[in-house]
Amino acid sequence: MDKSKIRNFSIIAHIDHGKSTLADRILELTNTVAARDLEEQFLDQMDLERERGITIKLNAVQIKYKDYTFHLIDTPGHVDFTYEVSRSLAASEGALLLVDATQGIEAQTLANVYLALENNLEIIPIINKIDLPSANVEKTKEEIENVIGIPADNAVCVSAKTGLNCEKVLDAIVDYVPAPKDADDNKPLKALIFDSYFDEYRGVIMLIRVFQGKLKVGDDFKFMSNNANYHVIELGVRNPKETKKEYLEAGEVGYVAATIRDAKEVHVGDTITLVENPALEPLPGYKRKKPVLFTGFYPIDTRDYAELKKSLDKISLSDSSLTWEQETSKALGFGFRVGFLGMLHMDVIQERLSREYKVGIIATSPSVEYKVVKTNGTFEMISNPSLMPDRTYIDHIEEPYIEATIILPNEYIGNIMDLCQNKRGIYKSLDYIDDSRSRLIYEMPLGEIVFDFFDKMKSLSKGYASFEYDLIGYKTSDLVKVDILLNGDKIDAFSIITHKDSAYEKSRDLTKRLKDAIPRQNFEVPVQATIGGKIIARETIKAFRKDVTHKLHASDISRYKKLLEKQKAGKKKMKMLGSVEVPQEAFLDILKTNVDK
């Protein structure tokens, strides 16, 4: 294959700017997919992606255009899936920067552009939705130049929906995206694993970009991170269905199957090389993103524990940012502590477990990872509130802080600044992009933004504000652990870590919701919220009262009193012996509301 005719590129865009639609047009114009087979969001294979209208998983497809070979690596646009974008960019030489002409540059567009620049990619601006009456092409070009700092004179103006000017995008890819550098078939093999998924019959399938050398069916290769050896049984390209080949050469993007059954053997970002003639140095990986949000996953039916473990194994194969470890809860039994990149990521994994793997789970209240510095000078990283040490051993607690960049219309600045202040934000700067939009920068605790910040920001700005963030480290905060007691017993699944100023309000809310969710017992049940043994909120679940006097004659007052006293004594004994059964529905209801809040 003539290496000068290969073009590897990704499409980067903010959510809803038309990225999947442009990918559909490219597939249609190049006859990669027959028009009769083409459906909207063709590369978004998950039902979840189609329903929500978002891209979650990256996808790679080979396209023939004139005498050129394109490899399009599709990427997600939501802030939670930045790690998928960075993997796509590591396998590309160029990026199409798609900007909606009616919305302009948004915060996540900016974040992805910086990723592309870090990877030294050629960026081609594409201005989309020019067919809409509200499109402002000139203003969008100005924003590309002023905010991002790249020239917009070669920007291609298109309507991905109608197909207007989309063939010009193909010519721009040929003209501006560079061919692969140092793509020599005769050098020792170096191929980057940028994604993987599981196939029941062939085991782990790896998506790779070959940077140098050649990989053939029958070759023995090894992973450079752990030296594990495997034998290639099948390889090929996706266009977009899998097409078998005898070999993959330098510059190509394709898939490899080697009957790998253990998902943990394959690390996305690893380099594969041949056993016989190995490369000396691995390829630089890509920037891995660490989970920022942690929650407990417990099977609704305890017999599904092994099934949940197997399902998490399979999902983490294609989602390298997902982390999990085993944990136990007195209230919920055996489960896993799972780490996510944000609320949408958590939501998607929960839904995938339910739909694809048919595993019903209870998810505990999400938490970030805190740094607990003890009085003896040591520290612990705690993501599970129930594992927080006793207050007497704690010197101080630090929580993760982020720098948030918010791009928004000027008329909503007051609303969004109020929201940031309420979330304990520290104002940093405000820049006016033009006469209608601004860039606002705040430092905020991560724990305040992972739950509902995104939704509140969208509703306060009528959907026009966009937001992206970077972790900047840990800062000391006045944090406390709130425990919930039911009839005097601590329920570890309901423990939360919160700021001292909001502890009372959250405790009142949680005890009230528990009172409403837990069915009445035969005895009175106190629901208490405590900080270090001190009760700060209480609700009482009233007891059922059986009418023990209904058979008595109205005038038999002494017998009447005797029966009531006997009932009272019985209830007292029951209360001492009785443990409160919390039904599954109550757990689901409380923890779901915790997430919603």
UniProtKB/Swiss-Prot annotation:
Function of the protein: Required for accurate and efficient protein synthesis under certain stress conditions. May act as a fidelity factor of the translation reaction, by catalyzing a one-codon backward translocation of tRNAs on improperly translocated ribosomes. Back-translocation proceeds from a post-translocation (POST) complex to a pre-translocation (PRE) complex, thus giving elongation factor G a second chance to translocate the tRNAs correctly. Binds to ribosomes in a GTP-dependent manner.
Coiled coil: none
InterPro entries: EF-4 (IPR006297), EFG_III/V (IPR035647), EFG_V-like (IPR000640), EFTu-like_2 (IPR004161), G_TR_CS (IPR031157), LepA_C_sf (IPR038363), LepA_CTD (IPR013842), LepA_IV (IPR035654)
Predominant place of localization: membrane
Protein encoded by which gene: lepA
Identification of the protein by name: Elongation factor 4
Keywords annotated in UniProt: Cell membrane, GTP-binding, Hydrolase, Membrane, Nucleotide-binding, Protein biosynthesis
HAMAP family for this protein: LepA (MF_00071)
Enzyme Commission designation: 3.6.5.n1
NCBIfam families in the cross-refs: lepA (TIGR01393), small_GTP (TIGR00231)
Sites where the protein binds GTP: 16-21, 128-131
Catalytic activity of the protein: GTP + H2O = GDP + phosphate + H(+)
GO annotation, biological process: positive regulation of translation
Classification of source organism: Bacteria, Bacillati, Mycoplasmatota, Mycoplasmoidales, Metamycoplasmataceae
Its membrane topology: Peripheral membrane protein
GO molecular function: GTP binding; GTPase activity; ribosome binding; translation elongation factor activity
